[in-house]
């Protein structure tokens, strides 16, 4: 396995572990079972979210810097928060997050997620820079629907598959 493929695999496994700390169900890499055309990782429940995982050595430093003082930022058409702050963002009802310059890497990743997602599925991106925690990015236009879905998962109202 090449170094970049191993890094991708390790990033996906790490993302699964991070999501399992937040949500009450198991996560798995899909590449092991399905290959292309599916999300990088999927929850083992009835959810309709397409998760694209990106792990980079650098490239998100500005976003991490902005998220030191804010729980949620807007970057272009994306909303971005630290995965560990998702509950805070939902509970605080943050309405007007601070605007940050566009993050091309995250915009490209969400475009890939939108292209690969099945019809009716919400595309999101989990991204992490080395030595940092996971970022969660989603399009502003799906914010309400995503938050409703996430609240359902956090309440444990999902069906295992």
Question: Model segments located where?
Answer:
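Catalytic phosphate/metal-binding cores of nucleic-acid and nucleotide-processing enzymes, i.e., regions
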Residues: 1-161
